């Protein structure tokens, strides 16, 4: 019973310490050509937040094979971080205001049509801040 109570009260403790987290997710994009960048819709906090980002977790799902050379970045208004896989965490946004929206940016280098097209099914971020 004590463990359950502790789990229920944990979010209140975190907020009292001035820390928190927000998450957002969205539909992905379709990229038909190499050498062209495509950006997701902005992902942002649904409630007012203050403070700076500490740790950001990301996840995206592709609908089909990963094209050779795929470059994926997660960008705030002030900086971008290269992502090394379909999910992970980064401290690359440390000290960026937690209120800034994030966007995924996809690009496959080269030229010509992508066959099959790159289809991003979904993308998600969880932003921890203090």
Curated annotation (Swiss-Prot):
Which InterPro entries would you find in this protein's record? Answer: FlhE
This protein's UniProt keywords: Bacterial flagellum biogenesis, Signal
Give the source's domain of life in one word: Bacteria
Q: Which residues form the signal peptide?
A: 1-16
**Which Gene Ontology BP annotations are present?**
bacterial-type flagellum organization
Q: What is the recorded function of this protein according to its Swiss-Prot or TrEMBL entry?
A: Not essential for flagellar formation and function.
What's the protein name?
Flagellar protein FlhE
């Amino acid at each position: 019973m004590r463990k359950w109570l502790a789990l229920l009260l944990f979010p209140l403790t975190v907020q009292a310490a001035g820390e928190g987290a927000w998450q957002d997710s969205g539909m992905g994009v379709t990229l038909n050509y190499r050498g062209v960048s495509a950006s997701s819709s902005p992902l942002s906090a649904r409630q007012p937040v203050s403070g700076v980002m500490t740790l950001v977790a990301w996840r995206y799902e592709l609908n089909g094979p990963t094209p050779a050379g795929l470059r994926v970045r997660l960008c705030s208004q002030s900086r971008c971080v290269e992502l090394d896989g379909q999910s992970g965490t980064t401290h690359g946004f440390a000290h960026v205001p937690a209120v800034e929206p994030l966007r995924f940016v996809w690009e496959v280098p080269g030229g010509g049509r992508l066959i099959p097209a790159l289809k991003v099914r979904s993308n998600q971020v969880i932003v921890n801040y203090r």
